[in-house]
Amino acid sequence: MAICAKRIIPPLLCTLFVLFVSPRFAYSTLAQTAAPQRSQTEVNEEAQAAYKAGTSAAAKNDFKTAETELEKVVRLVPKIEEGHSALGAVLLRLGKFPEAIKELEEALALKPGDVAAQTNLALAYAQTGAHKRAVALFEKIEAEAREKSASDPPQTLTPGLLFSYARSLAATGQLTAATAKMKSAVAESPQSADLHDALGTLYAQQRNWDLAIAQFREVLRINPQYAGGHLHLGAALLAQQQLPEAITELSLASEVAPENAAAATELGKAYAANNDDTKAIDEFNRALRLNPRSVDAMNQLALALQRTGENAKAVALLRQVVQAEPQNTEAGANLGLALLLAGNAKDAIPYLERRLAQSPRDVTAHENLAAAYMQMNEVDNAVRVLKSGLTHDPENFQLHYNLGLALKLKDDNAAAIPELEKAAKLNPTAHEPHYTLGILFMQDGRYDEAARELSLAMKMHPDNADGWATLGSLYRKMNKLPEAADALREAIRQAPDQPDAHLTLATVLAEQGNTAEAAAERKKGAELERVEMNRQRAEVATNTGNSLMKKGQVADAIERYQEALNDDPNYAAAHRALANALERQGRKAEAEAEREKADQLEKSRP
């Protein structure tokens, strides 16, 4: 909600551009550059007429005519200040800010005390972003007004001028001073919705939300149809997590100003904060239709798409954001994370490294970069980054846990175990450290400790078929056959198609003397192994077929898909790939039949 120096003249300021219209133009006693055949008197009379015509046109808001006439003045008598000052004011009204600045600077060089020229030049500076220069002139104007007030009736800056003064102060980081000026403007014109809105914006920039919200509510009391008031109030309420009211206000902003891309973007943010990414995505897309260059809308849409699993679209949008704003570290970090989630750690690492360099105390930046290094199997780099993160936050659960995993991958169990034990202490409700500790203790032959950690992990998180199978295998090694059988049966209940649990249970049952049940489990396990091997062969054949399709070798691809289905008739991916290949050959009926088989298999999948 920053106050922006837009390249437009706010309506509030339109009355500030003063044109001095003298009864007679000031004749020059200096030699002019007019044509030699004309007398100085004739030149001055023509300049006087042009000045009168120009200022008269300006008074009627005919600024194009005023510009033409006043250009004649400065051409005929370039050393007369009034011509430059009046032309500068007109150019300012026309939005020709660089040209206005040139004329107004010339006017002040000729007559430094011209308050109208000073005022208009300050406004022109503000409109072009030269806020430091604008502030210097505003300060001078204000000081001169105070000096005159000592002897004459009190003189204060107009509300419109205070408005522009405050905007320039805010742009130079002087928010306290800007707020004071804007409060003065509001006091002078308490029924101005524009001024209350600007004051509320300044409070929002300082995160003084209660005062900001009060000002925005006053804006809407004065003018219930003020779109900016609804927008800014909604954004302030969003910052305070008052989501239902924020959504209401931002919806009103969009109704009052349906072409306002910023309102659509803020409404999308409110929906996202309310965990409604479907509506958020609709609003961000609407914002981009209204303003395809909106970097904020692009960035927010990318994040929403990322949350809903559309990572490829998110990456494409974030690349556009980073290209538009190379210095936007947040967007770069988001792109790095999106690339990481897409499995492209190689491209992610430069963005994540840059983020960490810019925010060395950011724990999440350490976690993300370490994860990218792990994805690239650069385990030493991951360990280095995680240890660096712990120097900034030594009690961080995730850093200790991730470091334990990285050290485990280095087969450094002695170093990994203390990190995982620390993680378990930091977050007693997390099952992952206990499970990993159980695996490490089992690898080291420390079976009692392994059983303790694994059983604790399974109590905390029982929906883990692999965990029950591992615990069952451990109990078998410890000769705790009843416990082993119970754990393995639970593994089979959760994942009945996994062969290893059946085969291990068969061994346990045989050792218990239950030969008949052992034989049944062994037979089931062997059958599942055969199915698993067939599925693996089908996957290889299907992948080969996909490669052939990319090369345009459709007939050969069909052979590979059919080979895959001979190995595993229930492999839906092979049916779907075969359907696409048959369709390429124009065999639509056969293609549709294969596609139906794929649909049925996918629907029947648990």
Indicate residue ranges for each PLM-predicted region:
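TPR-adjacent "capping" and linker segments in tetratricopeptide-repeat scaffold/adaptor proteins
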Residues: 33-49, 149-158, 526-541
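Helix-start (N-cap) detector for alpha-helical repeat units in TPR-like alpha-solenoids
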Residues: 47, 81-82, 115-116, 149, ...
